């Protein structure tokens, strides 16, 4: 599971890589030291805009104009690179990379995400934004799509209409008031989500962390998949009709808070040492205590060593041969380390699949 989560973070990073190599530089705008420089460019209302720096805070907002405007106090030059490969450069750009040259490096400019600068940018509300920084926070609001990646900073995304993908290694991720397909991954930080709904019936919601907590509040997407290694996983809000929810945790607790009239089918795999605590009246469809019985029958194999007690005095070398038996016992017990529970609440409209290997699962009423 850990490898999968790190792989997911790596995938999110790859998505943010700058694409294309065809250069179409517009004229250069330079600023004096201490002066905030600003630059604009006409673009298609649904343009794809990429902004990337090595370090710095990035703030991106959508507006009603069909142009992008970039401002920075830390850069002396802002450069727009068209990568739409159009033959007619008089038409508004459909794909643009925003490049910055920081103060002190004008004589030896560093392109391709090497600038150290804080940046503010406005883009058309229908645009898709790709923002990336190694050390810094990212804020994106009011656009059609958002791809965001930060190694050590926090990511905040609001009011996105169609899709969101965000990944952070050491920072937290917050998503509010958005719709569409969602994929969020953080290795060391937590993930908080508020008011997210699908834009189409095929939209999915996926979130994963390694050590950070996951909090999902009022997520109405019908297909939800949340995974964490050691964080606490919490979901609060009504279930989508005929929704499918998957929750996996290695060592953290799970808390699912739902309305009192929630209707769902529960498919759970939980550790024998932990339990499911429910405020809801559950109708169990199988007997959870049955699986642990086979190990009790397997234990008498130890009797086979008693007749050999007389042999032990003659052959003390037999001791090491017993060791593999100790190793072999977990192989018999392992299949029953998790209890499989199937239960129904109400008419079972939604499906909740839970896998908890070391924490308690709580089903609470709002």
For each feature predicted by the language model, list its residue ranges.
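Intrinsically disordered, low-complexity terminal regions
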Residues: 1-366
